[in-house]
């Protein structure tokens, strides 16, 4: 349907797409859900992955542009044939926020929701103190902490180069892709943790 017709979407998908476009603008395009063709090309979810050629990258990079993802009430349109939206970077956070909202509506006052590296806090501990959450060190084995956060009622989301990757010719290639270069982002940071009111 990309490049051909508008697709009917649910209100939830519409909200996620609108948020995605907002984050694309705020990040100057570094957060971009239209990286679907790039994600498929690298195939990092598979242990072998795929190290793409320059020609392959040149084929998919022009398909990445959130400005070409159009959203109107109940419908979405990808402007160019071959475009694919990949909501992996935002969907889990959005779902986590919805679960938290549902629990709060049901009267839950104290809870820790752990969805992997998306952690949401409802209120504080029953005795009135802050929750303490450990942040995994991405350069160490599972369970070795880089930092500890104390908070109440917040969302703590971490993404790092240690989550999904493959090794090619002795070098690790992780899943956080730069939509401008087509390669895994090379920022010098092994992981980033955001503390905010929401997860999405």
Predicted features along the sequence, with ranges:
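Mature catalytic core of soluble alpha/beta enzymes
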Residues: 1-200
């Amino acid at each position: 349907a990309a490049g051909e017709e508008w697709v009917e979407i649910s209100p939830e998908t519409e909200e996620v797409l609108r948020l995605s476009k907002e984050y694309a603008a705020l990040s100057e395009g570094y957060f971009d859900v239209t990286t679907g063709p790039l994600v498929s090309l690298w195939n990092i979810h598979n242990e072998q992955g795929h190290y793409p050629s320059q020609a392959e990258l040149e084929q998919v990079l022009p398909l990445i542009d959130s400005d070409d993802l159009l959203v109107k009430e109940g419908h979405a349109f990808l402007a160019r044939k071959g475009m694919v939206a990949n909501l992996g970077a935002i969907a889990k956070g959005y779902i986590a926020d919805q679960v938290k909202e549902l629990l709060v509506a049901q009267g839950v006052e104290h809870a820790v929701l752990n969805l992997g590296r998306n952690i949401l806090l409802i209120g504080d501990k029953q005795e009135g103190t802050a929750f303490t959450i450990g942040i995994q060190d991405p350069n160490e084995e599972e369970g070795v902490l880089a930092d500890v956060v104390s908070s109440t009622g917040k969302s703590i989301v971490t993404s790092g180069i240690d989550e999904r990757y493959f090794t090619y010719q002795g070098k690790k290639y992780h899943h956080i892709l730069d939509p401008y270069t087509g390669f895994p982002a090379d920022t010098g940071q092994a992981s980033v943790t955001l503390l905010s009111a929401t997860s999405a």
